[in-house]
């Protein structure tokens, strides 16, 4: 994102910030946030009371939802502050911008929660990868695994922010408090992190897809090779959890990837893009806000789907168990009858 310096906004930037399209973007984002708060409350209830995910997966999803609450609240506060600022200073181009120092805490929370959204996708993938072996050390110590993942999800974004922004110029001016502070060095670092994020998220998605395909093929093989009811049930549960996580990762990567890709493209061709369109389009590029909107919806839907599939599988396994019992009972009867015949023949 391009920063604006000095304090006075150019005519193009002022017109872009006060245009109906910009106001529409603020209203649209705020509407999404309000709806996401409602669905988030339902998703938390669903995760808390419906025990369908393994311990670590469930708590990683809860941490993602809690992070979403913080992110949506931060974005709502930034947008409302911006709308108030634009209305108050609509005719004052030298007061319409925010000084970066006034946005320090909003900026920190915005990027902390946005980067957290990327890291919990990595954690969810690793959680499902380590869960492939039901007898592994990881499956026996899921609480420890969750704590390690959570610490990394918090510390890594802080470290990235420090590296990116520690030498930034906080006396510069920006249109909104979600814009990074201005500095040629930190700007280069910002786009490097942005590009790296796209590559890493794409890699995680491809790996998640391969993991899902592997779990699906293994589940099909178990139908013909494994007759232990408990083993088959646990394998199917693991498959359903992996599928749900893959869908969640796909939605997050789609939202975060596209909205990270656009600023990177704009950065390469910013000389040929007018400032007003630059800021108008970026106003809609709220990837983490969109991903936090879809996350609770997917959690609710996948939970209900897993419950339905579990009930279906339980009925199927019970039916198969009864068929096996009848089959073995008939075999026992035949074997016993044949044994009695042989005994009779020997006596005669």
Curated annotation (Swiss-Prot):
GO biological process: sensory perception of chemical stimulus
Subcellular locations according to the entry: Membrane
Protein name as annotated: Serpentine receptor class alpha-29
Pfam families: 7TM_GPCR_Sra
InterPro entries referenced in this protein's UniProt entry, alphabetically: 7TM_GPCR_serpentine_rcpt_Sra
Species annotation: Caenorhabditis elegans
First-listed, main subcellular location of the protein, grouped into a coarse class: membrane
Membrane topology: Multi-pass membrane protein
Key word Transmembrane present: yes
GO CC list: membrane
GO molecular function: G protein-coupled receptor activity
Keywords, ordered alphabetically: Membrane, Transmembrane, Transmembrane helix
């Amino acid at each position: 994102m391009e920063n604006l310096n000095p304090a006075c906004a150019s005519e193009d930037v002022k017109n872009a910030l006060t245009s109906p399209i910009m106001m529409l973007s603020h209203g649209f984002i705020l509407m999404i946030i309000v709806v996401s708060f409602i669905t988030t409350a339902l998703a938390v209830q669903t995760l808390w009371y419906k025990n369908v995910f393994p311990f670590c997966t469930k708590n990683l999803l809860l941490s993602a939802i809690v992070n979403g609450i913080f992110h949506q609240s931060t974005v709502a506060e930034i947008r409302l502050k911006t709308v108030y600022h634009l209305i108050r200073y609509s005719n004052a181009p030298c007061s319409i911008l925010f000084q970066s120092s006034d946005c320090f805490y909003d900026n920190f929370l915005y990027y902390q929660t946005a980067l957290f959204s990327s890291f919990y996708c990595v954690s969810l993938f690793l959680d499902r990868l380590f869960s492939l072996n039901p007898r592994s050390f990881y499956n026996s110590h899921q609480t420890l695994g969750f704590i390690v993942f959570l610490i990394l999800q918090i510390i890594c974004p802080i470290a990235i922010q420090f590296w990116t922004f520690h030498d930034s110029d906080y006396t510069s001016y920006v249109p909104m408090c979600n814009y990074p502070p201005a500095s040629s060095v930190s700007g280069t670092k910002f786009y490097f992190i942005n590009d790296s994020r796209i590559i890493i998220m794409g890699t995680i998605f491809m790996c998640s897809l391969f993991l899902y395909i592997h779990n699906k093929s293994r589940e099909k093989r178990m139908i013909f090779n494994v007759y232990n009811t408990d083993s088959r049930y646990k394998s199917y549960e693991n498959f359903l959890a992996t599928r749900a996580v893959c869908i969640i990762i796909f939605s997050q990567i789609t939202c975060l990837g596209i909205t990270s890709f656009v600023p990177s493209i704009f950065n390469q061709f910013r000389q040929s893009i007018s400032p007003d369109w630059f800021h108008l389009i970026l106003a809609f590029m709220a990837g983490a806000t969109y991903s936090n909107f879809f996350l609770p919806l997917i959690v609710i839907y996948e939970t209900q789907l897993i419950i339905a599939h579990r009930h279906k599988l339980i009925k199927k396994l019970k039916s198969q168990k009864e068929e096996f019992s009848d089959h073995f009972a008939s075999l026992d009867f035949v074997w016993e009858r044949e044994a009695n015949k042989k005994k009779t023949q020997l006596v005669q």
